[in-house]
Amino acid sequence: MPGPRGAAHGLAPAMRQAGALGLLALLLLALLGPGGGAEGGPAGERGTGGGGALARERFKVVFAPVICKRTCLKGQCRDSCQQGSNMTLIGENGHSTDTLTGSGFRVVVCPLPCMNGGQCSSRNQCLCPPDFTGRFCQVPAAGTGAGTGSSGPGLARTGAMSTGPLPPLAPEGESVASKHAIYAVQVIADPPGPGEGPPAQHAAFLVPLGPGQISAEVQAPPPVVNVRVHHPPEASVQVHRIEGPNAEGPASSQHLLPHPKPQHPRPPTQKPLGRCFQDTLPKQPCGSNPLPGLTKQEDCCGSIGTAWGQSKCHKCPQLQYTGVQKPGPVRGEVGADCPQGYKRLNSTHCQDINECAMPGMCRHGDCLNNPGSYRCVCPPGHSLGPSRTQCIADKPEEKSLCFRLVSTEHQCQHPLTTRLTRQLCCCSVGKAWGARCQRCPADGTAAFKEICPAGKGYHILTSHQTLTIQGESDFSLFLHPDGPPKPQQLPESPSRAPPLEDTEEERGVTMDPPVSEERSVQQSHPTTTTSPPRPYPELISRPSPPTFHRFLPDLPPSRSAVEIAPTQVTETDECRLNQNICGHGQCVPGPSDYSCHCNAGYRSHPQHRYCVDVNECEAEPCGPGKGICMNTGGSYNCHCNRGYRLHVGAGGRSCVDLNECTKPHLCGDGGFCINFPGHYKCNCYPGYRLKASRPPICEDIDECRDPSTCPDGKCENKPGSFKCIACQPGYRSQGGGACRDVNECSEGTPCSPGWCENLPGSYRCTCAQGYEPAQDGLSCIDVDECEAGKVCQDGICTNTPGSFQCQCLSGYHLSRDRSRCEDIDECDFPAACIGGDCINTNGSYRCLCPQGHRLVGGRKCQDIDECSQDPGLCLPHGACENLQGSYVCVCDEGFTLTQDQHGCEEVEQPHHKKECYLNFDDTVFCDSVLATNVTQQECCCSLGAGWGDHCEIYPCPVYSSAEFHSLCPDGKGYTQDNNIVNYGIPAHRDIDECILFGAEICKEGKCVNTQPGYECYCKQGFYYDGNLLECVDVDECLDESNCRNGVCENTRGGYRCACTPPAEYSPAQRQCLSPEEMEHAPERREVCWGQRGEDGMCMGPLAGPALTFDDCCCRQGRGWGTQCRPCPPRGTGSQCPTSQSESNSFWDTSPLLLGKSPRDEDSSEEDSDECRCVSGRCVPRPGGAVCECPGGFQLDASRARCVDIDECRELNQRGLLCKSERCVNTSGSFRCVCKAGFTRSRPHGACVPQRRR
């Protein structure tokens, strides 16, 4: 019955993006039934069943990219692949369309039922085999002989498929040639068999997407894609290439049919892809040059390959097929292989291997597929290579040196006297060739076969070459150097010729000398010329009818057979027709075939078709590097290298070393002989050298021939040595002759700087000033005035040629004659040592301060306030009281002064006191010392993590543990006081961490004790970091509102805002404003003018800093700013406040004032209009302006000047600022400096004892 009308049901794509397929344009063609052809076709072109069933089924196609690469290391290459993301296309009933478009995909539904092996490529086009044409490949092509040489549909350029006569109706935008590989997937419905169930099956394919990355050394495998098609069990699946990268036509096809309905319900799996090798190396299964692309093992080993593999290489198995193509079907038992050029399709069918579909076949030429074989046609200027898979460009033979030996140092030795071509050199006795010492390829490799296709001892004669490729239709190609190629008609043969093998005849290389008569490999019939010359070599083939592959019905396992049925062939006796069919062997006829019994030295072809010579040289019987093995018919010969001799033993011929050192006196009397494999070496004794003779010997060296041997005397030669007869000093011989006086003054300037006077046998020097003669009087040397020590005393003396320079040290100055340094008496200056005794020293002075005083600035003695300098003095059980030049401790009750009166100690110390450590996390945890004289309870019940002395630390017990409650029964922050007992139980007291640990826990802040614990208060602009135990600067620049439209720079306790001119920073608005905006800003400061004339000109600028408009006009100003803005009349402006409504947030929040208000000490109100405020600012107040000082400053007694506050003196009485450190006052602030012998640790910044190195 006819199929459904129109196109088959389409595919609904549901795609996911994948990296490797995102840019790939794939063409998916789905045939949902043989009856899906276009209407109006002939009746024979329509299917008869199964289409409707498949159209109702839902199927799915999954594309899984696999990206492969090749890694080579030390000559070993390995391929590895990685799985990419999947893409899925789903088709089901009810979504019929001609074209579906997705991201990176073009989906076309094809309604054509291509017949006779045709493959659907688009909506209206079939790719037909060479023997058929027509829209559906239903019409046999006229003259289907493969050798017609025509350009019709039967002969495609790159494969065996051709399109019908109808033009393709591809949708707009589709390209015939693409840089990507385009494949078609066909799902074809078959009639369901009896008893088959509905479960779906799936088929998998692994196809290449395009060429791999090619470099100068490594050719990476191309990326591949794994295609999985889920389909009903009655359907079959085919995948074939529509277009390859930069191709001009169809490239290849792959077919996969589902398994017959068997005992195994598991779906078929995709066979892996690997590398196909055509040659093998000695002791290795594979060669070094595989085909560029990936192939299946059955395609490789069933056609041109000898080995196949993926990460490892394996030799191809021997084919088990022993049948001969004769009339009628040829049956073999189950498990038998298909013949050469075919692969098994199922248990009863063999399918032709399309060698042209293998990547890299017939490079630089055209590949033509034949049933069971293929053909390579090379363009002019190219010839078929020995591997028969590529065309090689003809190049003129260059002649150069031929070397017979290559040393272990990669140096070429023993060149031949005549120049040879690389082929003549490497195919005979040469080991390297050319001026660059190019090594000859190893025997048996692909490179060796490339230049020596006939093996060692043979070379190609360019006068006559015969290239023969035998397939289903035999043909020969003759190349003539003197004329165009002439086609040769071959006789028809009743059977297929044996496959090619790597022998001289099968390579098509004739080893006989040139002859005048043209003859082919099969010399049975004369040749005829039937066509004029053409630019390409013409192919002449024997016509052969098409081969039909008939599928036999299913038979029992014992009767299953493989059938390949060629038609119109008569049965013949090959042994009788061709007596030399086996070559070097005897042909034995059989009932259905013949076999060959080969002679000694020959082996049977793998297909048992004829005898080929055994190449004994592959095993290197002559020895590596010892000789050249020449393979002969049935045997071999050894041509030993120099230094080796021929040895004939039970194991055959070989080359053994020749010991030349057995010959006496081989190296002469001046040396000895050392034998090496293949050569010998003469080692000469000292005083002898090797003479370049044949053979080389050691001869005496006449050292006296060299004039430099005895430059100062006469030379006398001796065997192996020489003797010099010295001349008198000042005399010299001329080449061993008489001794003559040497004029030293004429040979140079030995007395420079000075004058030379020649004397008999010597000379004399008169030196210039600053130089003196040397001890021998033969040269002038510089006088080192600095070495004598008489100049530059108390300075650095630098010697110069003929003189010297003085550089005085600190405390010295240069004398008038600039020859010495004189001391500077610093005590002559009154300010050198104020309050102390000045003692002048050489180059410096000393200021000795009385006891209890210290030197300030190196010039002033000041009383040391030990109590403020070290707040920890007398703590924790006493108070420090400063004295002039000393201090004393006032101890608490229960404590007494120490002997030095500088500390308080308990009358009785029931507890030991040691150091308290903060944590063990520091790299050097010994530096994290909180206190140095505390009990274990005071340490571990408060902030301590360990307690001990000198880094012998006892960890504090874990909080809430039994040990902790035993040590700290009252909890964190409390300790027991044994002096206070309530009801027999010691009372607890709070631990004052601020006194116990001081600045170690509240750095840069004020510590306030609480019960329990403590609080650390920081200055404005700082915050307390509980991990660092210190006040850390606040980065105001992190707040974008602080410096809008400007560049914010964080400072310690504040920040700066840099504006781009002419913009200015507005503190009130915390942003950069333009001049127009600043004009109306209340905080803008400019010059204040004391007078303003009637003409609007301002004059008399007021002294002091710039003021705002309000500050200027509320005082004595009459004009303001560079534009001389007039001030309003007194009492009329609203900008001058009448009551105190302002507050200074700085003074309200500054902890440094300790309760002092600016109204009391830091401001000055003036009743008059004038306000004098040096280093501060005037603020208008009722009754007059007030002088206010910035942070860190206070008003002096005059109330008109801001002076710096000495925080170290006023605020560090109890060590609130710098505990255990030295406080240094700065302008507006202060800083803490560690005492001598201490250094600041990280990360807490505490001062710890400096380690001695």
From Swiss-Prot:
It holds the Pfam family TB. Glycans are attached at residues 86, 346, 842, 933, 1225. Disulfide bonds join 110-120, 114-126, 128-137, 276-300, 286-313, 301-316, 356-367, 362-376, 378-391, 402-425, 412-437, 426-440, 427-452, 575-587, 582-596, 598-611, 617-629, 622-638, 661-673, 667-682, 684-698, 745-756, 751-765, 767-780, 786-797, 792-806, 808-821, 827-838, 833-847, 849-861, 867-880, 874-889, 891-904, 916-939, 926-951, 940-956, 941-968, 994-1007, 1002-1016, 1018-1031, 1037-1048, 1043-1057, 1059-1072, 1113-1127, 1114-1136, 1208-1223, 1218-1232. It is found in: Secreted; Secreted, Extracellular space, Extracellular matrix. Keywords: Disulfide bond, EGF-like domain, Extracellular matrix, Glycoprotein, Growth factor binding, Repeat, Secreted, Signal. Belongs to the LTBP family. Forms part of the large latent transforming growth factor beta (TGFB1) precursor complex; removal is essential for activation of complex. Interacts with EFEMP2. This is Latent-transforming growth factor beta-binding protein 3. It comes from Mus musculus (Mouse). The lineage of its organism: Eukaryota, Metazoa, Chordata, Craniata, Vertebrata.
